[in-house]
């Protein structure tokens, strides 16, 4: 179990601390004396975790989506992609490590894979800019998609970002234009593309690599135009809580599936993807494989037409 506990997991954390204490006593003072009680407490902790995660509200799901121990892009690549060769740079300005990508084999299929990487510790978070991509990151994504077309390869995107980087230098280098061009390339791509929202799907920074034929989302991930805290500040001037904003925004996987913004929810292990990363990544791999196999049977014209209709339908539903 991950050492990082969320606020709503505190009762579970207290119970697991007691289990750890009894385990130490059992090993030192009286070997085997507490085995029965330890097993009982472990079963109770598992039941508590299962019940808690079955009844998460929108704000709790937001916290889970941001959990630092959820699988990251580099983890998905290590688990699902063989012979991965990273490609760097946008051939215009620099290499942005907030978006990583390259070529590899996914369950025997040659693919182009790309995604946001947030980093896990201070050094890697700074290296990857906490997943906030700059213009060159999106231009690198465009370059990767152009390679996919050249070699007739499907594209798999992993989305996990709070948004594009809003700094002055980023604006000076045209981040809005880069996001727009990347979104356009996703929509007009002549090969199949699938996006998986694995944690946070924030604003244009997310949709720039998620305007795809199929959009999948993990059970406790979120997808929105702005973070709940930002919406609360802008729309309600801080008069509401972030939790109230999250509920009003309809950002959960379940809300998004009902509104047909995402195509499929991928179930997470009890306790979230961070509690069993291997099982979570296996589930993602199975879902992506199924979607890619269906899309590979379609020609370029059909792929583009279906993609366009998918996003037109989202716009039409918002006007009703």
From Swiss-Prot:
Entry annotated with the keyword Lipid biosynthesis: yes
EC number: 2.1.3.15
Pathway: Lipid metabolism; malonyl-CoA biosynthesis; malonyl-CoA from acetyl-CoA: step 1/1
Alphabetically ordered keywords of this record: ATP-binding, Cytoplasm, Fatty acid biosynthesis, Fatty acid metabolism, Lipid biosynthesis, Lipid metabolism, Nucleotide-binding, Transferase
The keyword Ligase is assigned to this record: no
SUPFAM superfamilies reported for this sequence: ClpP/crotonase
GO CC annotations on file: acetyl-CoA carboxylase complex
UniProt GO molecular function: acetyl-CoA carboxylase activity; ATP binding; carboxyl- or carbamoyltransferase activity
Domain CoA carboxyltransferase C-terminal, first and last residues per copy: 33-294
Example GO biological process: fatty acid biosynthetic process
Subcellular location: Cytoplasm
Domain of life: Bacteria
Class of this enzyme: transferase
Reaction(s) the record says it catalyses: N(6)-carboxybiotinyl-L-lysyl-[protein] + acetyl-CoA = N(6)-biotinyl-L-lysyl-[protein] + malonyl-CoA
InterPro entries: Acetyl_CoA_COase_a_su, ClpP/crotonase-like_dom_sf, COA_CT_C
Quaternary organization: Acetyl-CoA carboxylase is a heterohexamer composed of biotin carboxyl carrier protein (AccB), biotin carboxylase (AccC) and two subunits each of ACCase subunit alpha (AccA) and ACCase subunit beta (AccD).
Family: Belongs to the AccA family.
Task of the protein: Component of the acetyl coenzyme A carboxylase (ACC) complex. First, biotin carboxylase catalyzes the carboxylation of biotin on its carrier protein (BCCP) and then the CO(2) group is transferred by the carboxyltransferase to acetyl-CoA to form malonyl-CoA.
Listed PANTHER family: ACETYL-COENZYME A CARBOXYLASE CARBOXYL TRANSFERASE SUBUNIT ALPHA, ACETYL-COENZYME A CARBOXYLASE CARBOXYL TRANSFERASE SUBUNIT ALPHA, CHLOROPLASTIC
Protein name stated in the entry: Acetyl-coenzyme A carboxylase carboxyl transferase subunit alpha
């Amino acid at each position: 179990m991950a050492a990082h506990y969320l606020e709503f997991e505190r009762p579970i954390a207290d119970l697991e601390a007691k289990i750890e204490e009894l385990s130490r006593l059992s090993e030192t003072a009286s070997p085997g004396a507490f085995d029965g009680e330890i097993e009982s407490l472990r079963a109770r902790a598992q039941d508590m975790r299962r019940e808690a995660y079955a009844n998460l509200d929108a704000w709790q799901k937001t916290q889970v989506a941001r959990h630092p121990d959820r699988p990251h892009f580099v983890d998905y690549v290590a688990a699902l992609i063989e012979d991965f060769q990273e490609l760097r740079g946008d051939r215009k300005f620099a290499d942005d490590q907030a978006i990583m990508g390259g070529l590899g084999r996914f369950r025997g299929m040659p693919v182009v894979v790309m995604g946001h990487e947030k980093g896990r510790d201070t050094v890697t978070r700074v290296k990857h800019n906490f997943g906030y991509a700059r213009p060159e990151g999106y231009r690198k994504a465009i370059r990767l998609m152009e390679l996919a077309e050249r070699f007739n390869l499907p594209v798999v995107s992993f989305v996990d970002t709070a948004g594009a980087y809003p700094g002055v230098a980023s604006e000076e280098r045209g981040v809005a234009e880069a996001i727009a061009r990347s979104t356009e390339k996703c929509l007009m791509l002549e090969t199949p593309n699938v996006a998986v929202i694995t944690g946070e799907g924030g604003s244009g920074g997310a949709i720039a690599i998620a305007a795809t034929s199929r959009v999948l989302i993990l059970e406790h991930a979120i997808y929105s135009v702005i973070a709940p805290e930002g919406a609360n500040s802008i729309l309600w001037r801080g008069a509401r809580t972030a939790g109230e904003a999250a509920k009003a925004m309809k950002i959960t996987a379940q809300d998004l599936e009902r509104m047909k913004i995402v195509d499929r929810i991928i179930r997470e292990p009890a306790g979230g993807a961070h509690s069993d990363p291997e099982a979570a990544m296996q589930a993602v791999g199975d879902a992506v494989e199924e979607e890619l196999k269906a899309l590979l049977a379609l020609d370029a014209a059909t792929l583009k037409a279906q993609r366009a209709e998918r996003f037109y339908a989202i716009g039409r539903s918002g006007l009703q």
